[in-house]
Every structure is written in structure tokens, then in C-alpha cells.
Curated annotation (Swiss-Prot):
One of its GO terms (molecular function) is transmembrane transporter activity. This is p-hydroxybenzoic acid efflux pump subunit AaeB. It comes from Escherichia coli O1:K1 / APEC. It holds the Pfam family FUSC. It is found in: Cell inner membrane.
């Protein structure tokens, strides 16, 4: 496909984006808004953002959800801006500096919350800064400006949603159904690999792919939930399927690890059974029926615990899968599965990364302020706004440097494109609303196609072009003002990119160490006799951390294996029949405190000291288990965990 070719699958969204822009433009001028540009810009960003992220037309609900987040972020930013102005109107410089800190604070929060919701906080940060900068000449008009900005943004969002609904957005339900079938087959094939106990790298690749696919399925569940309330039952089932899929991965990998030391546990009966190849979900269904009969014949005691648990989880998965596909009423058996253990939320391991993002945003905004005051440039305020926008939006993404480059390319492309519209097209179409709408529809259509291709600079070009062309009421054509705005955007993006390069993010290794120590803490916390604590479902949170580790350190197999071993240890100890007595309960609390100290330690010396203390306590704990005559189901996992911690002590403690 050529660089300028248009694929059929890209046309519908391009028309949708053009429609959203035209609707916002028409409504903005019809209601005599002072700056319809904000409504048009909002409609374009809300519609194009999810398409750029998805690399194609977004699924149903994505644009609507992004619109709601933008409304929330705008209102938070407007309220914050009003509070800052009211409190510091007599000290303009201090007021702007506080706004810079507010933008940094919002970026810090957006780095810690779920990636889907971080957009609202990033928006809240730079909205307050936009209000404070814009009202500098006339501070008394602040409330009016805040209300107008909120109104224009809401109009733009409504127009984007209307355009989305008008062109019947894609439903993700069929993709979910197909993935559920395919995922079950992949789970069975992973168990086959683990029972064969073949090449470790092949097994590592297989379970790594399954972790990614299960995480992707969880993202699909979020999309399905946003799409319509009629999928509420399917959403409940998919949430439980997420845990079951992770359980299947854990049991398969534990089956592989057990054979490293005790291969005789997997009998020839099960080895021969899992030799049969499967290609479809129907094949898996037949094999599971046979497998349940084999287990009933051999007895639970003669069946390895990992295979028994795997079959139980796969059977539940099948039952819920049928319910998701048919979306029928939840029956009593399903309800029993869905009333599972409460999920545990873990503390973010990226606090240092979030603090780096805070300083990047704050320092870049302060640098923009100093540049504005030092030069006295009329478009310094525009540069300030672009700095805040780039840093607030870039920091929450995995590669902020590339986002900043995208904005630089976009603002550079917007200069000639905006010049064409400013000097030729808009002056010749402003007398006709129809011609004006057609001209902007053409812009939206072609940039909409490029956005879906994820062309570098396409998203920045769309937003920057709309921002600098004259879409005010009434329209005024001052070339110097246009040039200042265009150059201000470019300078702002370059300054933001410079700060991102200078303030380096060296938090990757620290985040990796914190994640690994959180796995250790989770395994240690599973050693408890507290009934409520044992019922907590840590599995989704642990695999979410593992997925983050895989993204931070792609290809680092030793780290992944260590993390997976800790997850397996957690699951095995959680179900182990630990003797119930006060002596062991008190020691469990002591080990949990020590594990927490390992995570919170700020220096390598303290971390090594607490880790050594934890290893000593585990040795004492093993002795206590022997005294209290704990069964092998308890002593063996604890012994394996202690051995792993001794083996990887340096990786878990040294920077």
C-alpha cells in the first residue's frame, strides 16, 4: 500500500471525523459562540484520539468514554483555575507558578491511575493553565471565560458522539467471542507443552503470549462495558474469566516447574492423554469431558494437584464462555462462580517514575513562563499552552519522547497547511457556511485517514491546524497574529521536547526491583491462617504487575521466570493447609512486616539488611512448621520459596 493510498476500512472513520468537525463548526456559529474553534478542536481530538491509539476505527463506546473523561477533566481544570485566580489575583507571577505546579501535580496523578482514566487528569492540569494565561489582560472576565470554555467543549464532545452514533460504530462483541474460543485452545496447548517438559524458551514464549492475550481480553471487556448496558451480564462473566485464565496459566507453569525436581508426579496416563493435539474449542471441550472421566476413575488423590486445579478452572471457563457468547441470564451455577473472592488492589510500583513526570511537566511550564516573560513575545502564552499540553499528555504514555516528536512534526506540518487555509480557503469561503463546512470536512477526512495509519505527526497536525486557523466569531484576519500562533506552537513543542531530553527518566531499574519485591511480599503474605486474608484474590493484580514488568524489560526472561515463580508460590501457599495456632499467626505477621520493610527501604544497605532478616525468619519458620508437624503441601512450597529468594537475593536488593 502506497504512502498516500486510501484503504476501504479507513473511509468510514474519516467520514465520521469530518462529520464531527462540521457539526461542531455549524453549532458553534449557529449559537454565536465567541470561539467556535474550541468546539471544533474538541470534536476533532475526542474523535481522532481513540482512532490514533487503536490504529483504525475505534470500537463502540471508546469515543463516548473519552468524551466523558474530557468533560470531567475540563470541569476539574476550570474549578482549579478559578480557585487559583481568586486566591492569587494580586500576585500574577505567583499565580502562574502555582498553575505550573498544578499541571505537574495532575501529571503525577495521571501516572499513578489507570491509563484509561489518566486522560482526565492530564487535561485538568493544562486547562487551569490555559484559563490563567488567557485571562491575564482581563482578570475580571475569568468566570465568563471558564463557563464559555466548558460550554464549547461540551458542544464539541456531543458533536463527536453524535457523529460516532450516526455511522454505526463497530461492536467489539464478536472479537471477544472469537478471542474466548481461541484463548481456551491456547491454554490447552500450553498445558500440553508443560506436561511434555520440553524446551524452556518455547514454554516461556507460550505463557508470555497468554499473559498478553489475557490482558488484551481484559481491555476488550472494558470496551464492551463502555459500549452498552446490555452487556452487563457478559461483563460480569468476563471479569471472572480473567481470573480463571490467569489461574490456568499459573497451574500449567507450576506443572512444568514441578517436573524439574519430581517428574514422577505426572503419571504416564496424563502424559498420553495430553499428547492428543487440539485445534478448536470443540476439540478442547471433548478432551475436557474425557479428562474429567479419567480423574473420576483415578481419584483425586492420584491426580496431581496442578492438573486437578487446571481442569476445574478450565471447566468454569467453558461454562462462563458459553454465557458470554449467548449473553443469557446468569444461572445459579454461574452465580456461584461469580461470587468469588474480592480482588486486591496493589500500590503502584511507578511512584518514582510519576515523580519524574511531575518534575518534567512543572519545570517545562516554568521554563515556558520564564521564556515568555524574558522575551515579551505576544505568542509566548501560546508556547506555554503547547508546553503544558505536550508534557501533560506525553508523560502518561510509555514513550514520551516520541509523543513530543509527533507534536513537533505536527506543528511543523500545520504551518503550511494552516497558511493555505488562512490566506486562501477561509477568506474565500467565510461568506458561505456550506463552503466553510466543506473545506474543513476535506481537512478532517484526509487527516482522519492518516491518523488511522498512525502516521507520525498526523494527530499533532490535526489539532495544531485547527488551533491556528481563524474560527472565531467574528472572523478577523491578522497575518502577524496567525504567524505568532503557529510559531508559538512550534517553540512550545521544542521547549517541551528539550525538557523531556534533559530530565532523564532513570526509574526503570527501580520500578523493576519494586515490582519483584512486591511479588516476594505477595508470596510471604500468602502464609497466613486468617480466613478473610486467604480468600482475597491477588491473581489479577499480580499478573498486572507481571505485564508491567514484561513491558519495562522486554526479553528479560530471568526476571519473568522469577516473578512467575513468586506468583506460583503465592497461589500454592494460599491453598496450603497451614496449622492454625497463635505461634504461627504471630510469626506470619512478623514476616509480612519485614517484607513491607524490604519494599519501602530507600537505600541498598537497608534493603539488604531487611532481606537478610526475611531469609532468617523463613528458616525459623520452616523449623516451626516441622515442630507443628505441617504436611508436605505446606513445607515444600515454603522450602522452594526460600531457595528462590536465596538464589536471587542480589537481583532483589541491589540497584
Amino acid at each position: 500500500m502506497g504512502i498516500f493510498s486510501i484503504a476501504n476500512q479507513h473511509i468510514r472513520f474519516a467520514v465520521k471525523l469530518a462529520t464531527a468537525i462540521v457539526l461542531a463548526l455549524f453549532v458553534g456559529f449557529h449559537f454565536q459562540l465567541e470561539t467556535p474553534r474550541w468546539a471544533v478542536l474538541t470534536a476533532a481530538i475526542v474523535a481522532a484520539g481513540p482512532a490514533f491509539a487503536a490504529g483504525g476505527e475505534p470500537y463502540s463506546g471508546a469515543i463516548r468514554y473519552r468524551g466523558f473523561l474530557r468533560i470531567i477533566g475540563t470541569f476539574i481544570g476550570c474549578i482549579a483555575g478559578l480557585v487559583i485566580i481568586i486566591a492569587m489575583i494580586r500576585a500574577p507571577l505567583l499565580m502562574i507558578l502555582v498553575c505550573c505546579i498544578w499541571a505537574g501535580f495532575c501529571t503525577w496523578i495521571s501516572s499513578l491511575v489507570r491509563i484509561e482514566n489518566s486522560y482526565a487528569w492530564g487535561l485538568a492540569g493544562y486547562t487551569a493553565l490555559i484559563i490563567v494565561i488567557t485571562i491575564q489582560p482581563e482578570p475580571l472576565l475569568t468566570p465568563q471565560f471558564a463557563v464559555e470554555r466548558c460550554s464549547e467543549i461540551v458542544i464539541g464532545i456531543v458533536c463527536a458522539i453524535m457523529a460516532d452514533l450516526l455511522f454505526s460504530p463497530r461492536s467489539i462483541k464478536q472479537e471477544v467471542d472469537r478471542e474466548l474460543e481461541s484463548l481456551l485452545v491456547a491454554q490447552y496447548q500450553l498445558m500440553q507443552l508443560c506436561i511434555k517438559h520440553g524446551d524452556g524458551e518455547v514454554v516461556d514464549k507460550a505463557w508470555g503470549d497468554l499473559v498478553r492475550r489475557t490482558t488484551a481480553l481484559q481491555g476488550m471487556r472494558s470496551n464492551l462495558n463502555m459500549e452498552s448496558s446490555r452487556w452487563a451480564r457478559a461483563n460480569r462473566r468476563l471479569k471472572a474469566i480473567n481470573t480463571l485464565s490467569l489461574t490456568l496459566i499459573t497451574q500449567s507453569c507450576e506443572t512444568y516447574l514441578i517436573q524439574n525436581t519430581r517428574p514422577e508426579l505426572i503419571t504416564d496416563t496424563f502424559r498420553e492423554f495430553f499428547d492428543t493435539p487440539v485445534e478448536t474449542a470443540q476439540d478442547v471441550h471433548k478432551q475436557l469431558k474425557r479428562l474429567r472421566r479419567v480423574i473420576a476413575w483415578t481419584g483425586e488423590r492420584e491426580t496431581p494437584v496442578t492438573i486437578y486445579s487446571w481442569v476445574a478452572a478450565a471447566t468454569r471457563y467453558q461454562l462462563l464462555k458459553r454465557g458470554v457468547i449467548s449473553n443469557t441470564k446468569i444461572n445459579a451455577t454461574e452465580e456461584e462462580i461469580l461470587q468469588g473472592e474480592p480482588e486486591v488492589k496493589v500500590e503502584s510500583a511507578e511512584r518514582h517514575h510519576a515523580m519524574v513526570n511531575f518534575w518534567r511537566t512543572t519545570l517545562s511550564c516554568i521554563l515556558g513562563t520564564l521564556f515568555w516573560l524574558w522575551t515579551g513575545w505576544t505568542s509566548g502564552s501560546g508556547a506555554m499552552v503547547m508546553i503544558a499540553v505536550v508534557t501533560s499528555l506525553a508523560m502518561r504514555l510509555p514513550n514520551p519522547r516520541m509523543v513530543a516528536i509527533d507534536f513537533i512534526y505536527g506543528t511543523l506540518a500545520a504551518l503550511p497547511l494552516g497558511l493555505l487555509y488562512f490566506l486562501v480557503i477561509i477568506p474565500n469561503t467565510q461568506q458561505s457556511m456550506l463552503l466553510l463546512c466543506i473545506s474543513l470536512a476535506v481537512l478532517g477526512f484526509f487527516l482522519g485517514i492518516e491518523v488511522q495509519k498512525r502516521r507520525l505527526g498526523s494527530m499533532g497536525a490535526l489539532a495544531s491546524t485547527i488551533n491556528i486557523i481563524v474560527l472565531d466569531n467574528p472572523m478577523t484576519f491578522h497575518f502577524s497574529q496567525f504567524l505568532d500562533s503557529a510559531l508559538g506552537q512550534i517553540v512550545g513543542c521544542v521547549l517541551a521536547f528539550t525538557v523531556i531530553l534533559l530530565v532523564r527518566d532513570k526509574s526503570r531499574d527501580r520500578t523493576g526491583r519494586v515490582l519483584l519485591n512486591q511479588f516476594v511480599s505477595a508470596a510471604v503474605s500468602a502464609m497466613t491462617t486468617n480466613v478473610a486474608r486467604r480468600k482475597e484474590n491477588h491473581l489479577p493484580a499480580l499478573y498486572q504487575q507481571l505485564f508491567l514488568l514484561m513491558n519495562k524489560f522486554p526479553g528479560d526472561l530471568p526476571k519473568f521466570r522469577l516473578a512467575l515463580t513468586m506468583i506460583i508460590a503465592h497461589q500454592r501457599l494460599r491453598d496450603a493447609p497451614i496449622p492454625v495456632n497463635e505461634d504461627l499467626s504471630a510469626f506470619h505477621r512478623q514476616m509480612r512486616r519485614t517484607a513491607d520493610h524490604v519494599i519501602s527501604a530507600r537505600s541498598d544497605d537497608k534493603r539488604r539488611r531487611y532481606f537478610g532478616q526475611l531469609l532468617e525468619e523463613l528458616e525459623i519458620y520452616q523449623e516451626k512448621l516441622r515442630i507443628w508437624q505441617a504436611p508436605p503441601q505446606v513445607t515444600e512450597p515454603v522450602h522452594r520459596l526460600t531457595g528462590m529468594l536465596h538464589k536471587y537475593q542480589h537481583a532483589l536488593t541491589d540497584s
